[in-house]
Amino acid sequence: MKKTALIIFLGCAALINCMAAAPLAEADKTSKASLPESRPEAAVDQLIPWLLDESRQLRGIRFAEVIFDTTGKRVLPVNPKSEVDRRVVKAITTACDETVKKLNAPASAIQSTTRINEVSSHFEDALRELLNAEPGLSCDLPRTAQGRVMRSGYPDLRIIALASKRVFYLDPKLYAVGSRDSSFRTFYFEPKIATNKVREDAVHFIAGFEHKPREKSGRWNFTRWDLVDLAQFKVKLKAEFQGSNRDIYRPEAIVATSAK
């Protein structure tokens, strides 16, 4: 049932995108008719009931299913019997230890950073540098289907074991002490064709780094980390309808404004 709900949602979302891109003339045509009569089976009308029923249908979905249904690629579990997997896990372990040590240093770049969101890129850069220095491994920013490098969006890093060509995706996450069991959203994946960065069957990892509250002196202190295999990771859908300022403040929609 969850699989069906996910497929219906993805299909409806794709159809809505197509409808949004339709010619304006067609939009003008439909606006002349009443909404129920002009599009009784419109994708949005099919989508809304699924969103309202998300507590039953769209929770506890395996991330591996989401990846496969949106990209056609498989999320591979770590194989503890594989020499390649053991070697990569060991390399990531060493890189995580060295990254924490490096960035906790008083002179590190993060110690002059005020917002924790701005610290994340330093972890990505440090891990990438350390993993690239590991013989037999390559680590870089994953590219989209068009070959573009994007820092935003999942995943952050792509590791490849050069001899076997086995791919590992690594996504560093930072969280505060005491928030480990929080139910607030800390992970998201947005299915898009143009900006998709998952392009191979791969092992998917999250490296979670825990930090203390920023000290009065301004110092950041990271205390521990965990490497998580996402093969059995489950997610839920939180759908929202969005609009920009350009969408809101259209001249024809403004009915009053302040005096000049």
Locations of regions flagged by a protein language model:
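Bacterial N-terminal signal peptides that target proteins for export
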Residues: M1-I8
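Bacterial N-terminal signal peptides
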Residues: I8-N17
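Bacterial Sec-dependent signal peptides at the C-terminal "C-region" and cleavage site
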Residues: N17-A27
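Interdomain/boundary linker segments immediately adjacent to catalytic/signaling cores
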Residues: D28-A126
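A short acidic/basic microdomain associated with nuclease active sites
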Residues: E124, R128-I160, S164
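Conserved catalytic cores of phosphodiester-cleaving nucleases, focusing on short active-site segments
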Residues: L157-I159, F168-A176
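Short, charged, amphipathic alpha-helix that recurs within catalytic cores of restriction-modification
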Residues: Y175-H211
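Domain-level recognition of nuclease-like catalytic cores that cleave nucleotide substrates
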Residues: K197-A259
